[in-house]
Amino acid sequence: MKKGALLNSDISAVISRLGHTDQIVIGDAGLPIPATTTRIDLALTQGVPGFLQVFEVVTQEMQVESAYLAQEIVKNNPQLHETLLAQLSQLEQHQGNQIALHYISHEAFKEQTKQSRAVIRSGECSPFANIILCSGVTF
């Protein structure tokens, strides 16, 4: 049995195949997922698993160089936004690198998901609870 925090074999496989600057998305239950993008659906019911739970486990396994958020999260989901910024700051300290954070419109965000290796769908049902994570290197 795998010893690490991430037990989901589909997510583990995607992360293991990421190259520098490849992207994966962690999305809420309502984010549209392009038909051409790998869909990893974790949603069981509203709120389960939560966006932050998925983010925390994925980032334990993935080296993150940069990230994209929909700019609408700032106004429409300020509590989640602040919590996410704090978690990104902790991740920077743990990884020993600065994570560039980019804000784009929600429409541009949805377009950008088409470039991602996979979209991980959480059960989160709060507005704009989505992030695109860009892979870094560990050396």
Curated annotation (Swiss-Prot):
UniProt pathway annotation: Carbohydrate metabolism; D-ribose degradation; D-ribose 5-phosphate from beta-D-ribopyranose: step 1/2
Residues noted as binding substrate in the record, renumbered to the chain: 28, 106, 128-130
Entry's localization field: Cytoplasm
GO biological process, one term: D-ribose catabolic process
Gene3D superfamilies assigned: RbsD-like domain
Name of the top EC class for this enzyme: isomerase
Record Pfam families: RbsD_FucU (PF05025)
InterPro entries to which the protein is assigned, alphabetical: D-ribose_pyranase (IPR023064), RbsD-like_sf (IPR023750), RbsD_FucU (IPR007721)
Domain of life: Bacteria
Entry annotation: catalytic residues: 20 (proton donor)
UniProt keywords, alphabetically: Carbohydrate metabolism, Cytoplasm, Isomerase
GO molecular function, one term: D-ribose pyranase activity
Documented EC number(s): 5.4.99.62
UniProt GO cellular component terms: cytosol
Keyword Isomerase applies: yes
Catalytic activity: beta-D-ribopyranose = beta-D-ribofuranose
Family: Belongs to the RbsD / FucU family. RbsD subfamily.
HAMAP family assigned: D_rib_pyranase (MF_01661)
Oligomer status and interactors: Homodecamer.
Role noted for this protein: Catalyzes the interconversion of beta-pyran and beta-furan forms of D-ribose.
Protein name: D-ribose pyranase
Species: Yersinia enterocolitica serotype O:8 / biotype 1B (strain NCTC 13174 / 8081)
This protein's encoding gene: rbsD
